């Protein structure tokens, strides 16, 4: 008899249970794919993911900016005029003014100047802030050519790799939302050159076909390995850096950025770009021939 009562109560509970999606009870089940509610839920989820990514990115940026502040505070005591010139150069005049300040303290405070240059360059590259080209020019003014070239290549490789990792961690929603079409096109190009990807990245770094910031933030999304990305960037920025460093040796002269880069330099860059992609072309031709 007790069993009969339990069964009866269970049946009564079942009769009063509100089905999933019953509007009278105010509950809703998961929306069907393709429905308007499903699209709204998907949009809300994407917006929430984008907001969280932006919050993380801002936090990382503020932390990096604080590190830059500490680097600046560790710099030698500067006069008022020198402090005005201690800024990221936006043109050749700014680069010359900053070069004069740094060259004054370089011999006495060699490590501090080198660390400040290194940190600033990587900071700009990591967050895709314009101005690194003038720091490349400035390196030719401050340091011997071999050190300047190695320093610029290393800073470019590390900064671009940090940008890559930022995109991998928090930048995917931005790429998916705003750069989908361009990322898909570049993904197709990467797949064509997957067997010789280092040569392809070197070629892209030498040539102006794709902006560097676009390469940095989309590479992790389309599965370019970080090791290949770093090596290709380190080697690929060397030819343009060669031109910029050479221009830095004339920084004391009254020149503009356009005058500092000659047509001979541009011609050399074009030749190096072609040479960087030739191994991939020959490999593809040989493969087609033997197949």
Curated annotation (Swiss-Prot):
Region spans: Disordered: 1-38
Residues in the signal sequence: none
Key word S-adenosyl-L-methionine present: no
One GO location term (cellular component): mitochondria-associated endoplasmic reticulum membrane contact site
Catalytic activity annotation: a 1,2-diacyl-sn-glycero-3-phospho-L-serine(in) = a 1,2-diacyl-sn-glycero-3-phospho-L-serine(out); cholesterol(in) = cholesterol(out); a 1,2-diacyl-sn-glycero-3-phosphocholine(in) = a 1,2-diacyl-sn-glycero-3-phosphocholine(out); a 1,2-diacyl-sn-glycero-3-phosphoethanolamine(in) = a 1,2-diacyl-sn-glycero-3-phosphoethanolamine(out)
Highest taxon of source: Eukaryota
UniProt keyword terms in alphabetical order: Autophagy, Endoplasmic reticulum, Lipid transport, Membrane, Neurogenesis, Phosphoprotein, Transmembrane, Transmembrane helix, Transport
Phosphoserine PTM positions: 35
Main location: endoplasmic reticulum
Membrane topology reported for the UniProt record: Multi-pass membrane protein
UniProt xrefs under InterPro entries: TM41A/B, VTT_dom
UniProt entry tagged with the keyword Protease: no
Coiled-coil stretches: none
Molecular function GO terms recorded: phospholipid scramblase activity
Modified residues (Phosphothreonine): 18
Function: Phospholipid scramblase involved in lipid homeostasis and membrane dynamics processes. Has phospholipid scramblase activity toward cholesterol and phosphatidylserine, as well as phosphatidylethanolamine and phosphatidylcholine. Required for autophagosome formation: participates in early stages of autophagosome biogenesis at the endoplasmic reticulum (ER) membrane by reequilibrating the leaflets of the ER as lipids are extracted by ATG2 (ATG2A or ATG2B) to mediate autophagosome assembly.
Annotated family: Belongs to the TMEM41 family.
Domain notes: The VTT domain was previously called the SNARE-assoc domain. As there is no evidence that this domain associates with SNARE proteins, it was renamed as VMP1, TMEM41, and TVP38 (VTT) domain.
Self-association state and partner proteins as the record states: Interacts with VMP1. Interacts with COPA, COPB1, VDAC1 and ERLIN2. Interacts with ATG2A. Interacts with SURF4.
Protein name: Transmembrane protein 41B
Gene: TMEM41B
